A protein has these predicted regions:
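Generic structural signal of hydrophobic/aromatic residues within well-ordered alpha-helices
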Residues: 44, 48, 115-119, 215, ...
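Alpha/beta catalytic cores of nucleotide-metabolism and tRNA/nucleoside-modifying enzymes
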Residues: 49, 96, 124, 151-163, ...
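Short, acidic/turn-prone active-site loops that include or flank metal/cofactor-
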Residues: 7, 26-29, 139-141, 186-194
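Non-catalytic, usually N-terminal nucleic-acid engagement modules in DNA/RNA processing proteins
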Residues: 1-89, 241-242, 246-271, 275, ...
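Eukaryote-skewed repeat-based solenoidal scaffolds used as protein-protein interaction platforms
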Residues: 49-183
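Low-complexity, flexible helical/coil segments
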Residues: 15-16, 33-42, 56-63, 95-99, ...
């Protein structure tokens, strides 16, 4: 699960996470609304440390990156190259402030040349992206040209980078999903806005855990992904979620519908997923260590809650 810093900031307390999760900086919303980051690097690092300590199981955290969509550039009044430099500088600053926290570098750009330039900026500052467990690819979630994104992703993969694509489209994952480590999506929440709630407490399904898991299954089946067996559980999907879409108002025992942005805790989590890709899956060893250290064939599809 990918949770936004904007949803967690200011909360007095948090539940403990029952499984690994990742933190999104909420940068697109922050820059779109305010044209700048109102939180400095030190304050953000302090917040991330609190999440890692109090929630636990933090797999990785995005830096205070600067997106490069046209609407964001218009709002900040800065150039694309300035956004790239600030993204790199912020990662370096966070790494110096909190070397023990799992911040990942993020590449920003519009064209393929832009992304190569951003990668070169990291390299010139001594960051060997090819040795890192994960590198984010930003500013792709609103792209309508899937072939263009595919060219960017494949070119970055050719440089030896293990990629997480922020908000990649499902049509895109059909084409280049075999080259990335992970991706995330809020499509389940957007589509759920137009579905009546499954219980009296739900006006719609936009924040419903059962609806999210049902969407998750449909997408992974469409992408021809097969479940990866969770080494800590005998089931990859809670039994109460197997019967179908969230139309019966039945949620897993002990769990309640997850609200967008809530910390990933208490409810049983679905197992991780890896692709079958129309050929027999390779032999796997039990998953150990941090989630993004696993074999590239074991890629999750992450539900974004932000």
């Amino acid at each position: 699960m990918l949770v936004s810093h904007r949803r967690l900031a200011g909360r007095r307390g948090f539940p403990r996470a029952s499984g690994p999760w990742a933190l999104d900086s909420g940068g697109f919303t922050e820059l779109s609304l305010h044209g700048r980051w109102r939180t400095d690097a030190a304050t953000y690092a302090t917040a991330v440390r609190r999440y890692a300590t109090e929630i636990g199981n933090l797999d990785w955290a995005a830096p205070r990156d600067w997106m490069t969509e046209g609407s964001v550039l218009a709002r900040t009044g800065l150039s694309l190259s300035t956004h790239q430099r600030r993204t790199v500088t912020d990662y370096l600053r966070l790494r110096d402030l909190a070397p023990d926290l799992p911040f990942i570098p993020v590449l920003q750009g519009q064209s393929l040349t832009d992304y190569h330039h951003c990668a070169d900026l990291y390299e010139r500052h001594g960051v060997d992206l090819a040795t890192l467990p994960l590198v984010g690819v930003g500013s792709v979630c609103r792209r309508q040209h899937t072939a263009e994104v595919e060219a960017i992703v494949r070119a970055l993969t050719a440089r030896g980078y293990r990629l997480h694509t922020f908000g990649a489209k499902i049509l895109g994952l059909d084409r280049y999903g075999d080259t990335i480590i992970s991706s995330d999506s809020m499509s389940w929440s957007f589509s759920g806005r137009f579905v009546p709630g499954c219980s009296p407490t739900h006006r719609s399904e936009s924040n419903c855990r059962g609806f999210a898991l049902s969407w998750y299954r449909r997408v992974t089946q469409r992408l021809d992904f097969s479940p990866h067996t969770d080494t800590t559980s005998t089931s990859t999907v809670p039994q109460a979620e197997r019967s179908g879409p969230c139309s019966t108002a039945k949620h897993p025992p002990g769990g309640s519908p997850a609200r967008a942005g809530s910390a990933p805790a208490t409810p049983p989590r679905p197992g991780r997923l890896s692709p079958a890709k129309r050929r027999p899956p390779p032999k796997r060893t039990p998953t150990t260590g941090r989630r993004h250290h696993r074999d590239r064939t074991q890629r999750p599809w992450t539900l974004r809650c932000c």
